[in-house]
């Protein structure tokens, strides 16, 4: 297939729309089911690159959950704890395959943002992963292949219209890439930068103890940032991105946004949230929305009189701000990556409040000394990578 006609571009008024290969080669994808849209394919190609690089860097199956050309989550296939199974709504599925575990983590990091996602998988989609995808609200999936059982499950989604794309894992794009804006063609070399342990060798803080687990998490953070709209900051713990701040104009807003998401991920693991007495017929998306409000200062919107009856069998107790702060102090050894340098120490101060201990950023600010000093104050380990990872 040399070109694929699309229903429309970014918006319904943008017609005609298609994807094709300028060099006349066949497209590196096969549409197995459904009809992908313009933004679906942007998510698919960015997501595929992300999971392919995660697999190469860690040796583990990888998955990402994309929305509007940025990842909402990304993870590798490490086993899930019992608590993680509960907060990702997979505790009823038994033991999951590594690939399914990766997607459960990627989807579960920021379930509000992942609603209606486009999924990318590094490995052949197996039955476990398909069963997990089937019960989530999702636009589509891209993978290098699918088992027969997985295809049968996925094709039953969205009344048979779920978008399933198979990508050629051997496809290598041209070294130069182009795009047109306002009738002007932009050309640049592809960002083929390889992210591995060597990137984290320049440790500039007093604390220089960087365990292997932190190196894996830093690699996940930096690879995730490589395919996230800039400016961006990514918090990672235990093989999964737990907070991604994408597309912000200031670095501190990235750090705050990603930190707030990481905090919500950890608050979901608290006894107060795990013990919420939900009605049995409450849908998964409604549970996610309710939890998101419950752990905020707007909790009265879901537990106030006349409201709690919609969601719960009995009125939950308030999860106070003081209780939330106390719980968040238990979140430790979080890693953080930034796609460009920290211009001020305020980013480190905010990161510290979300349990960050390991940081990777390019360095190069005129205030590097202040940023390093702030890290030293908290005993953090910070690497200067010397590379910027802007993505647009």
Task: Label each region the model flagged.
Residues 1-199, 214-232:
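Active-site loops and adjacent core secondary-structure elements that bind or stabilize anionic groups
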Residues 23-35, 109-115, 189-208, 285-307, ...:
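Gly-rich Lys/Arg/Thr-decorated short loops/hinges at beta-loop-alpha junctions or inter-strand turns
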Residues 53, 227, 264-268, 353, ...:
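Conserved helix-loop functional segments at active or binding sites
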Residues 57-65, 164-167, 230-237, 267-278, ...:
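Flexible, glycine/charged-enriched surface loops at secondary-structure junctions
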Residues 70, 125, 237-240, 248, ...:
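Active-site-proximal loop/turn and secondary-structure-junction residues that shape catalytic pockets
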Residues 72, 117, 121-122, 135-165, ...:
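C-terminal binding/interaction regions
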Residues 72-111, 242-341:
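Glycine- and Gly-Pro-enriched alpha-helical subdomains that act as flexible
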Residues 220, 228, 235-238, 245, ...:
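Nucleic-acid 5′ end/cap handling module spanning
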